[in-house]
Amino acid sequence: MTLPSLPHRRMGAGLAVVLVHGYLGGSSQWDAQVQFLSQHFDVIAVDLAGYGNANHLPAPTEMAAHAQAVLLTLDQLGIDRFHLVGHSMGGMVAQEIVSLAPARVRKLVLYGTGSQGSIPGRFETMARSRERLAEDGVKSTARRISATWLLDNEASPAFESLATLATRASAQAAHAGLIAMEAWDGRARLSAIQQPTLVVWGERDRSYAWPQIEKLWRTIPCASLAVVPACSHALHLERPALFHILLLEFLHLLLHEAATSS
């Protein structure tokens, strides 16, 4: 597959922070984070192939291809080194980016994600998601799954915007994403991640159960853990102010180092 340059949103100046969304997501889900982080950083939020503003692009069935497309896009933007934030499936893409280009990643945030793409303990199995997708179609599936990402389901203030974005995924990408996740396994490479890493998890996450989070935290050598109470899978939408504090606090040391070395 020929790798495309990905649509993206960019704002701010300084050290680069790259935001990678998850399954049925898109760059617009990071709007609040782009606004906040751009006060301190050069922020780039990408749309993975098949999703959001990239729904015209064919989605790969391998995580490594998503990672290569992100790296190609950053190359074209002239960005060499960057902080990396990956959510859900985007966390798998982020782990692939670290594996492909470890020297380019400064700090890593693995948020609501894991190292096992079959996602044991998920609200439903990948096989069942594929069945429901085939039966119900993308739009119905997108709204149904989006509800599981929020503590208050459809009653959450964030639901409509999240679900509307999810319905923009192409049918091909919705299928390809499930295939890519189920086939992916990053457990053997966790101990090789040398970047300072922040693992973030909402304690009521119905997509990624605690054993997945614990595996990241205990296996990545320089990992810290933040567990946010009373939140589900999309805590950056449920508790954005707290999420911003966690990110900025984690990146603060590097800000200080950059200032003192310039």
Show the residue positions of the predicted features.
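Conserved HGGG/HGGXW glycine-rich cap/lid loop of the alpha/beta-hydrolase fold
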Residues: 6-56, 73
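Short beta-strand/loop motif that positions the catalytic acidic residue
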Residues: 193, 199-201
